[in-house]
Structure formats: structure tokens, C-alpha cells
Amino acid sequence: MLLDAGAQYPAIGVTTFGSSRHHSAGDVTDREVALGINPFADGMGAFKLNPSSHDLASGQTAFTSQAPGYAAAALGHHHHPGHVSSYSSAAFNSTRDFLFRNRGFGEAASAQHSLFASAAGGFPGPHGPHADTTGHLIFPGLHEQAASHASPNVVNGQMRLGFSGDMYGRPDQYGQVTSPRSEHYASSQLHGYGPMNMNMAAHHGAGAFFRYMRQPIKQELICKWIEPEQLANPKKSCNKTFSTMHELVTHVTVEHVGGPEQSNHICVWEECPREGKPFKAKYKLINHIRVHTGEKPFPCPFPGCGKVFARSENLKIHKRTHTGEKPFKCEFEGCDRRFANSSDRKKHMHVHTSDKPYLCKMCDKSYTHPSSLRKHMKVHEASSQGSQPSPAASSGYESSTPPTIVSPSAENQSTSSLSPSSSAVHHTSNHSTLSSNFNEWYV
């Protein structure tokens, strides 16, 4: 596709596609110079962003040729270098800065963050065509960068938007002009083409784009099934490793659990708490094995929930929390309580029958609901902690405090607790001892 951008971007060195323009140095008018039009650009030009003349080395100007025929005939190399430089710098830079600021072009991290190839390619110069062809790559960051380039992320102050397959770069013999300003514009302008920014910085190397893609965590799932013939000491488990849960479950079901010909449904997984107690049906054994493998094949279908379950019955009960369904009504006359599952209704029925099946093992109290028993057990936990030295006193808090810091009133305090003022003093006095004590508490 040919794009005529000359009328729209006259101030950034963009020429019209399709027709060649041949000028001599004498044809350059003051108006063209002030507008930043490059009279020596060929018809197949593209975006050319050059730094100002004061940023370039001697012998270079703010405008260079883009066509092969004028590779050595830039304005700075021949007739009127001083004339062109004096008129071009201020007008070109101010217009370019205003254009890119108002068109919302963002800034990128480096020159490699854009679609445009770096300064390399088959651009013919006075010494013949350049041998390197990495400039023709649409995404050179995904391929190996040429080791012969001294600075592959520098585009020598130029950025060209051409055709796919015709991404030309500047040859190395003209690649000696670099400056912070040229690198800045080469990396930041035209960042608006964000959906195609697939190249990363040159120092990341080839394929660095893929570091932003989360790599799946490789896991090894080990089969700990012990065959009946290997039950003799020392017991030897299967120990086959698998990379996916599906492979492990298929292996256990087919090779260990077996088909309908198996009459004994016994779990012989390593350290299984059932200790060889058989199941009445095969499906119950398969459901039990999920405790060992961690398989949970029943996800909640409601969006945003994300919970998964090992048993379909548990999923069915869980879905009632989303739907609000409570199919189990209290059977006691006059009670209209309803429940999502039968176990909750059974616990509730003890309120009406005055049964207290939940006994405290530390005293003679009993309760109708397990939640009441859990609250009661906290009383025993608090009393047991009160009869013994508290963690703060037994972990060396007072022993780690210098005697000059502790007041006489603080020394007479109970060892079971510390006041906020004294604890604050201890906290500021010895940080290393305090951190070690916390590690001891929560291990």
C-alpha cells in the first residue's frame, strides 16, 4: 500500500511516495528549508527523524539523503552545509516537537520497543550493499541480533515506516553519529503503534518478549501406590512421576485400582490412615484416592467463584450458597428454619430435643451444637495459658532488657503480662532479640 504523507507531515522529512524528486543544491528555497522539507529525498522515503545540527558530528547536518542515489550527497557533505544548518535546526525541531506532543505519541523504554528495525540492512552505500540483512526483519527482537554491531539499539537518529519486508536501515559506514537526543527520538516517537510493539530492549537478547508471558510451573506428581506384593518391609511404592494431574489419575485408576474384576477395594497409598480397611464400592475408593492425589474435578460453574471440589455432592451443596436454595426444613412442629444441607438440619434438631451430644473432654459440660463447644474450648485454652508463663515472659523479653531502662515499677509487674509502656520499651531496646522471639512463636 502506498501512502502519501508528504502533505500531512511536511515538517518531519516525509516525502511523497510514487514520484522521484531530483534537485540540485541551488534549487533549495528558503521556504523549503524553513519547513524542514528534504529536497534530496527519493520517492520511496518514509519517516526520517534526525537530531538537530548541533547534536551531530562535524560533516553532518540535520538532513541526510534517503535514496540510494544520494547516499553520499547529503546536504552536509556538499555545497551549502552552513546555509542549510542555520535555517533548518530551529524550525525543524520546534515543528517536530509540537507535532509529536499534540499527537499523543508516548515514550518507550528503548529503540527496540517499536516495530522499526535498527540501523542495519541492505541499504547500498558507496562501498556496495551492506551484507547484514537483519534490518529486513519485521520483529528483529525475536531473532538473533547481529554480533557485529557495536550498538544495535541505536538507529542513528532515524526511524522509517516503510512497507512490510522493506525495513531498510542505515549502513554501518554511516552509523558513527549518535547522541542522547537522537536515541531519545528513535525510541520514543511513533510509540502509538502499541499493538505491534513486540520487540524488547537489546540487552534482553532474542525472545525477551516472552518473559512477560507467565510460564507454567512445572510440577512433578508422584504415585505413592504400594502394590500388594510389595507390602513386605521395606515397603516400596510405585514412584512414577507425571507432569499433569490427568496423567496421574489415569495411571492410578487403570494400573492400580483396576477394572470391575477387582473385588477388594482397598487403598494402599503410602501412609493412608485407613490402614487397609476396604470400601464397599469402587467409586468410593476412587473418591477417596482424591484425598491423596489432590484431584478436584468439580469446579463451581458460577462466574467469579473459582472453588473446586473433589466430590460432586459437595459441589451440589456449595451451589446452594449462590442460589439461596434451602430444601431441608426443620421437622419440629412450629419451627420454620430451613437449611441448605441435611447435616446442618440434624445439628439444629438437637435444640428441640435437648440432646447435647457434643461433650467437652476437659470438663463435664456438653452442648447441642459443635460451634458452642468450640467457643467453650477457648475458655480452657485461656485458663491453661494463664497458669503457665506467657510467651512474652518466657521468651526472654525481660531478660533481654537492660536494667537501666526498666523502671522499678516495671520490674514489679506480673510475669504473665506486660503493660503497653513497658512492652514499648522492650521493643525499642533490643530489635534482634525480639525478631528471634517472634520466629520461635510462629514456627
Swiss-Prot record:
The keyword DNA-binding applies. Residues 371-433 are annotated as: Disordered. Induction: By chrd/chordin, zic1, zic2, zic3 and zic5. Suppressed by bmp signaling. Keywords: Activator, Cytoplasm, Developmental protein, Differentiation, DNA-binding, Metal-binding, Neurogenesis, Nucleus, Repeat, Transcription, Transcription regulation, Wnt signaling pathway, Zinc, Zinc-finger. InterPro entries: GLI-like, Znf-C2H2_ZIC1-5/GLI1-3-like, Znf_C2H2_sf, Znf_C2H2_type, Znf_ZIC. It is found in: Nucleus; Cytoplasm. This is Zinc finger protein ZIC 1. It comes from Xenopus laevis.
